[in-house]
């Protein structure tokens, strides 16, 4: 069980996979916080200390005990008016203006499954994935009952918290402050990490030492805002990406919020998160209830990366509900930066044609398709299609776009109204404004009062009438201003609930529409929005270099799959910066990936580069979106921005690096990777170079020296699973080969083993042999790789000439009798070397052959201590070859061999008809020799013994 109650001590213990959260109902009925941190099975009530501290009052129920004070004890949900003079979580005012609620324990319930919040987004889970603890506290005199809700998702290492408040009295009360979570820590010296910003530059990381007093931030803008994200990390001073204690809080809410971190008089720390108490005063009549939105809490003892992974898993698995959350999503192109308001239906169709030719999946028609909207001064609220501008109906346009083989998306801004609109002229009172005062304009628009159902219904019906005109595949929901004219204390909260109601109705009616959130970019990038839309436009700033910072900060809580990121034109429309198409593409691949540009203005070379970009993204899309995301550097501190995605199985990894500035005579730059298997062997796809996971993580990879500013690189690593499987199979076949571990027959330590790896040209022999060697070395077994390419009678160029001569003189039968026989191969030489190795000779002359005439040498090689010789060679299964203990056959086909040879690019005639026929004849022999192999590596990667 994830939740345990000790009735003797009245201790609640909440256990996740790696953390423990504990609290206790004390003898006076107060709910005290005991512990949150690394997993523990101990009752932690011993951490409570009691001391008589001047001016820290004592509850009357404590009698004459001056050491008991709520001003110093760690509390689970502190309230105003109880003698706790620190920041509090709850403040309720009664009709007389008294602000005092003393919450005492009444009851609790533990149940399977995760609680839900009516009208609010919240983490969801099945009954076997989560448990709920509901603790009821109350103040009978004040007539208030508070239900503390805890959701425990054991596998995710997260605990959610929400609060349900009920007026149980006969009079009215007003909630003046309501936070969802409080965390009291009795020890430690902490930093606060918050994510500040502005429009077009959101979620910049700022780490501040928490001194005495309060550090607070939040939003009073009606949205979670560009300026501060509703997320916070409390970290010990020495915490880094990879080590140290840190706590996270993430508010699942899209409106006004507040976060308060306080270090008190005796160096205790209190962290609070919930609704902002500014512009908030919520009335409750007798019997009415109020729900505080949810906070997701998590703890990591292993630094920020692990904390991020826990949040990423929680959001992608238990917040996002869209069917698109784990699906391949379309690569889109948006009309905004391509045309802004200046477009027609033909413009959109032309964009679709260009998109199709580039491999783009979807065209999105952005702002300007409705009412009479040719600029941002009119028509918001009039959600009817401007058929004159589009040159026909929306249905016709959608069909024309779909006819190009691409999907169709559309932009909306349901919460807004222009004064120059039919809606405003008919219902001016539907716009939010303070009675008797003129409203505050922003972007020449006003905010509709979505706290009112009749307003929501009108807009919803208008939007549905548009969506029902054709198959719309995607919708971008925008929101381009803050709330200023707050006419009542309940407005800001009720407005957000109205938005959620609208979104719930929309996604329920149109489950097959991919919904992307937006608020001037990342002004409402929060977990509340992700409950309805699986992705959010990360920022209106598409500059690749700025985006490395924006996406870096975003990644601390939100998964890559949630970040809308596009390649835009240069000079960039926000910064004027020029970066290469490659750099822009690599940066945008750390998100949902798409384009914000006019393809008609691109050169043929740029278009071809975009085609290749899209192929690359689609190749790695699920690795990027579903893999584990690692931050490798900080773009705020380092000369490069680097990040990587690692598959859950750790068998694939994609590393991306962007240089942030250039420097003359620069030092070499290395990037250390993360999240790989230390002992595994990985091959880098582009170079064919092999590394162990330990080498990549501890030494890193050197970057090419910069030729120009803002260069970017990608490295793709694949774990050589066939080599590991082969190694395990070989160990079973030949027993323990470790040096110095002889058995009674001395066959283990003294006997030398010869393994041949053979298969068609380009079948991966060299790769498998090198990886196999590394696995032997990992196991402390000395191993040598010998290549069979050194043993033809002639250098490769002359050998191909001789093959052609044989064919011309004797035909195909003659060629068949030449290939792989002593006529072509110096079997005597290689058999001599293998024989000397097996006899135990330590110094052996090994033949080496180059690619030029006369480039043949015999080099003395020291085999002292070497127990295994791996021969990698096309003819490693030949009947003429002697001394092989374990022949290993790599299955392949002539078609695969041809493709690999061409890709390898080593032989200029690899695709010639003659060479292709040679490969086919060699394959005939290989197929026969393969039947004599001891071990076979199949085309499907399976390894088995024959």
Range-by-range predicted roles:
Residues 784, 793-852:
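Conserved nucleotide-sensing/catalytic segment adjacent to the nucleotide-binding pocket
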Residues 906-946:
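Small-molecule kinase domains that catalyze NTP-dependent phosphoryl transfer to phosphate-bearing small molecules
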Residues 389-393, 425-582, 592-597, 601:
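Active-site neighborhood of glycoside hydrolase catalytic domains
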Residues 241, 634-677:
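Carbohydrate-binding surface patches
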Residues 856-904:
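ATP-dependent NMP and nucleoside kinases share a basic, alpha-helical "lid"
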Residues 324-461, 474:
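Aromatic-lined carbohydrate-binding/catalytic grooves of carbohydrate-active enzymes
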Residues 693-722:
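C-terminal beta-strand-rich structural cap/linker in extracellular carbohydrate-active enzymes
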Residues 5, 10-13, 17, 21, ...:
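Polysaccharide-binding surfaces and accessory modules of carbohydrate-active proteins
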């Amino acid at each position: 069980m994830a939740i345990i109650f000790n009735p003797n001590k009245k201790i609640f213990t909440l256990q996740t996979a790696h953390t423990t959260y504990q609290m206790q109902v004390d003898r006076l009925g107060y709910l005290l916080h005991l512990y949150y941190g690394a997993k523990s099975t101990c009752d932690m009530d011993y951490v409570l200390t009691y001391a008589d501290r001047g001016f820290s009052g004592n509850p009357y129920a404590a009698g004459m005990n001056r050491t008991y004070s709520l001003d110093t004890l760690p509390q689970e949900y502190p309230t105003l008016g109880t003698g706790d003079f620190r920041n509090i979580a709850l403040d309720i005012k009664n009709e007389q203006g008294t602000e005092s609620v003393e919450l005492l324990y009444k009851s609790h319930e533990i149940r399977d499954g995760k609680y839900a919040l009516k009208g609010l987004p919240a983490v969801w889970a099945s009954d076997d994935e989560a448990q709920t603890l509901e603790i009821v506290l109350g103040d009978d005199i004040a007539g208030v009952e508070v239900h503390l809700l805890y959701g425990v998702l054991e596998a995710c290492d997260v605990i959610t918290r929400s609060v349900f408040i009920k007026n149980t009295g006969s009079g009215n009360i007003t909630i003046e402050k309501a936070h969802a979570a409080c965390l009291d820590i009795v020890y430690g010296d902490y930093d606060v990490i918050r994510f500040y910003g502005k429009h077009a530059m959101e979620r910049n990381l700022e780490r501040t030492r928490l001194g005495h007093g309060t550090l607070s931030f939040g939003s009073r803008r009606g949205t979670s805002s560009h300026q501060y994200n509703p997320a916070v990390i409390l970290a010990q001073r020495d915490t880094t990406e990879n080590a140290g204690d840190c706590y996270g809080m993430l508010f699942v809410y899209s409106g006004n919020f507040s976060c308060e971190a306080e270090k008190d008089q005796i160096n205790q720390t209190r962290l609070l998160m919930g609704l902002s108490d500014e512009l908030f005063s919520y009335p409750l009549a007798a019997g009415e209830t109020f729900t505080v939105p949810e906070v997701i809490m998590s703890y990591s003892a292993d630094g920020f990366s692990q904390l991020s992974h826990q949040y990423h898993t929680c959001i992608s698995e238990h917040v996002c509900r869209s069917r698109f959350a784990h699906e391949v999503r379309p690569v889109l192109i948006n009309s905004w930066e391509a045309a802004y308001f200046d477009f027609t239906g033909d413009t959109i169709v032309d964009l679709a044609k260009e998109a199709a030719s580039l491999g783009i999946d979807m065209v999105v028609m952005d702002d300007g398709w409705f009412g009479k909207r040719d600029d941002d001064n009119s028509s918001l609220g009039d959600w009817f299609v401007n058929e004159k501008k589009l040159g026909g109906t929306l249905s016709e346009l959608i069909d024309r776009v779909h006819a190009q083989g691409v999907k169709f998306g559309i932009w909306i801004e349901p919460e807004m109204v222009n004064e120059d609109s039919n809606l405003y002229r008919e219902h001016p009172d539907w716009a939010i404004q303070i009675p008797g005062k003129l409203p505050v304009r922003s972007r020449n628009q006003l905010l509709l009062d979505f706290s009112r159902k009749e307003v929501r219904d009108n807009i919803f019906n208008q939007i549905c009438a548009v969506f029902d005109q054709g198959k719309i595949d995607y919708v971008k929901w925008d929101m381009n201003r803050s709330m200023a004219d707050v006419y009542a204390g309940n407005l800001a909260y009720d407005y957000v609930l109205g938005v959620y109601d609208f979104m719930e109705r929309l996604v329920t009616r149109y489950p097959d529409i991919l919904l992307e959130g937006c608020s001037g970019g990342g002004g409402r990038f929060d977990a509340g929005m992700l409950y309805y839309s699986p992705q959010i436009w990360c920022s209106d700033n598409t500059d690749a270099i700025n985006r490395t910072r924006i996406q870096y900060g975003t990644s601390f809580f939100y998964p890559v799959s949630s970040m809308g990121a596009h390649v835009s034109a240069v000079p960039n429309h926000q910064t004027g910066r020029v970066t290469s198409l490659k750099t822009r593409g690599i940066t945008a691949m750390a998100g949902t990936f798409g384009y914000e540009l006019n393809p008609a203005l691109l050169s043929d070379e740029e278009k071809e580069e975009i085609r290749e970009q899209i192929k690359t993204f689609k190749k790695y899309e699920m690795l990027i979106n579903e893999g584990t995301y690692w931050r490798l550097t900080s773009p705020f501190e380092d000369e490069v921005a680097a990040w990587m995605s690692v598959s859950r199985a750790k068998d694939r990894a994609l590393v991306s690096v962007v240089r942030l500035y250039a420097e003359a005579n620069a030092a070499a730059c290395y990037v250390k990777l993360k999240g790989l298997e230390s002992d595994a062997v990985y091959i880098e796809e582009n170079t064919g170079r092999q590394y162990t996971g330990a080498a990549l993580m501890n030494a890193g990879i050197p970057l090419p020296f910069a030729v120009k500013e803002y260069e970017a690189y990608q490295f793709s690593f694949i774990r050589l699973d066939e080599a590991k499987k082969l190694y395990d199979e070989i160990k079973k076949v030949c027993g323990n080969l470790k040096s110095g571990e002889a058995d009674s027959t001395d066959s283990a330590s003294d006997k030398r083993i010869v393994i041949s790896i053979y298969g068609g040209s380009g079948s991966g022999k060299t790769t498998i042999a090198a990886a196999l060697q590394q696995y032997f070395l990992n196991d402390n077994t000395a191993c040598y790789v010998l290549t069979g390419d050194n043993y033809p009678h002639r250098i490769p160029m002359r050998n191909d000439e001789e093959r052609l001569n044989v064919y011309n003189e004797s035909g195909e039968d003659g060629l068949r009798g030449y290939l792989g026989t002593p006529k072509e191969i110096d079997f005597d030489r290689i058999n001599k070397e293998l024989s000397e190795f097996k006899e135990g000779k330590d110094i052996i002359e090994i033949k080496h052959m180059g690619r030029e005439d006369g480039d043949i040498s015999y080099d003395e090689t020291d085999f002292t201590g070497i127990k295994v010789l791996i021969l990698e060679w096309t003819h490693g299964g030949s009947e003429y070859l002697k001394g092989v203990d374990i022949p290993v056959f790599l299955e392949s086909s002539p078609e695969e061999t041809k493709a690999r040879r061409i890709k390898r690019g080593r032989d200029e005639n690899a695709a010639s008809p003659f060479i292709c026929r040679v490969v086919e004849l060699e394959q005939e022999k290989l197929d026969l020799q393969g039947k004599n192999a001891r071990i076979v590596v199949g085309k499907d990667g399976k390894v088995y013994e024959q």
